[in-house]
């Protein structure tokens, strides 16, 4: 069991190295393998020590989501960010990443909720503060345009 845990950790470390080098296809394959391995461990009767840590699993989902975001597969990326949040609800980064996509797609109310959650979890997250302010401004502008269009 210890060997499986070390192998899983090595997979995650290698995935991160590929990610940092911009080798996204390799990183995505390794993150996916890690996520599958965690799902198998969680669904089997293995001892709790053999399962993946929530932090590592959430990081794998978040980083795989980033790769999908880079490919402009926004909905798939949001699925991974949501999975990261479900595994580790106090991990602010996937809320921020999902909020960015929601903002880009024009779902300002949902983006606002994610950015507010980031700041609840980490009040010093400057990019989230800026994104929240920009989302509010763009939502107000959209509302002004809609009102003007209806006259």
From Swiss-Prot:
Repeat is among the record's keywords: yes
SUPFAM superfamilies xref list: TPR-like
Keyword list, A-Z: Repeat, TPR repeat
Start and stop residues of the TPR repeats: 8-41, 58-91, 92-125
PROSITE patterns xref list: TPR, TPR_REGION
InterPro entries in the record: TPR-like_helical_dom_sf, TPR_rpt
Protein name listed in UniProt: Tetratricopeptide repeat protein 32
Gene it is expressed from: TTC32
């Amino acid at each position: 069991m210890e060997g499986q845990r070390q192998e899983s950790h090595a997979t995650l470390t290698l995935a991160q190295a590929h990610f940092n080098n911009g080798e996204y296809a390799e990183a995505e394959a390794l993150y996916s393998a890690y996520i599958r391995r965690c799902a198998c461990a969680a669904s089997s009767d293995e001892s709790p020590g053999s399962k993946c840590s929530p932090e590592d699993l959430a990081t794998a989902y978040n980083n795989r989501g980033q790769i999908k975001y880079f490919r402009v597969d926004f909905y798939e990326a949001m699925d991974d960010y949501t999975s990261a949040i479900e595994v580790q609800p106090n991990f602010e980064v996937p809320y921020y990443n999902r909020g960015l996509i929601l903002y880009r797609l024009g779902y300002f109310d949902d983006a606002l909720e994610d950015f507010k959650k980031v700041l609840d979890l980490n009040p010093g997250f400057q990019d989230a503060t800026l994104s929240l302010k920009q989302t509010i401004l763009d939502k107000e502008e959209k509302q002004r345009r809609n009102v003007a269009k209806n006259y």
